[in-house]
Each structure stands twice: as structure tokens, then as C-alpha cells.
Amino acid sequence: MLQNTSRFLARAGATVGVAAGLAFSLPADRDGAPGVTVTPATGLSNGQTVTVSATGLTPGTVYHVGQCAVVEPGVIGCDATTSTDVTADAAGKITAQLKVHSSFQAVVGANGTPWGTVNCKVVSCSAGLGSDSGEGAAQAITFA
């Protein structure tokens, strides 16, 4: 789990954070860029399971799926307790179940350094994915 968490933070955290900072809802566009959809994405309850679906991915590539937030300028904090790895199918698609939290203990960096508490009712949070090569996307999530 620690190895998966470290990979998630080192690769996906940055990817998810950058994607989240640029645009919270990134459907796949016509040139095949990765797109992600989170269902449901609004009015969530703490501990609820959402479905993260993505298209436009590199087939056979492992993607790290998780919940993150920008915790400081240029710093992404993620919930390492629920991150998971999923391999894109031959069509470049994935579907994963992800438990999300309205508040979580964020970790940052490849070593999973504790950062502190993230309250997704106060700051913007996202669910998304990223690969070791930095390919990924994210969508904003909100809690009731």
C-alpha cells in the first residue's frame, strides 16, 4: 500500500492537482486527450463511494486514482487512505470506485509527508487520476 501511495502522490497528485487547477471538469476532447467523469460529483456525503470513469488514456497503462486538493500554492495534498491503481483497458478507458471524504488527513510528496487536515467543505477538492508519465485528469467534487 505504501508503494502505491507513494506512486500516487508522486505522479497522480501532481497530475490531479494541475488538472484540477486548470479545469475541474475535463471531458475527453476530440484530439483524444484524457477526460474524467466522477459520478456523483456534487452533494456528496462523507465516506460515499463515487465512480471515476476516464477515456482517452493510454491502453495498458496503470493510473493512480484518488482524492486531492491544493493545500498550498503549488502543493497538492491527497487522501492516501483511499487511493487505488487501475489499468486502462485496450480502448484507453478505466472505471474505478473511490471512497471520498469531506475531510481527510492530506499527505504530500513522494514520501507521503503528513500535511494536515483538508476540509472539502471549505476548499476545492477533486477526484481524478494520473499515470507515472504525468498523463491524467480530474473533476471537482463537492459535499453537502
UniProtKB/Swiss-Prot annotation:
Keywords carried by this UniProt record: Antibiotic, Antimicrobial, Disulfide bond, DNA-binding, Signal
One GO BP annotation of this record: defense response to bacterium
Alphabetized SUPFAM superfamilies for the sequence: Actinoxanthin-like
S-S bridge residues: 68-78, 120-125
Single GO MF descriptor: DNA binding
Signal peptide feature range: 1-32
Domain of life of the organism encoding this protein: Bacteria
Family the entry assigns: Belongs to the neocarzinostatin family.
Function, in words: Binds non-covalently to a chromophore which is the cytotoxic and mutagenic component of the antibiotic. The chromophore binds to DNA as a weak intercalator and causes single- and double-strand breaks.
Name the UniProt record assigns to this protein: Macromomycin
Native source species: Streptomyces macromomyceticus
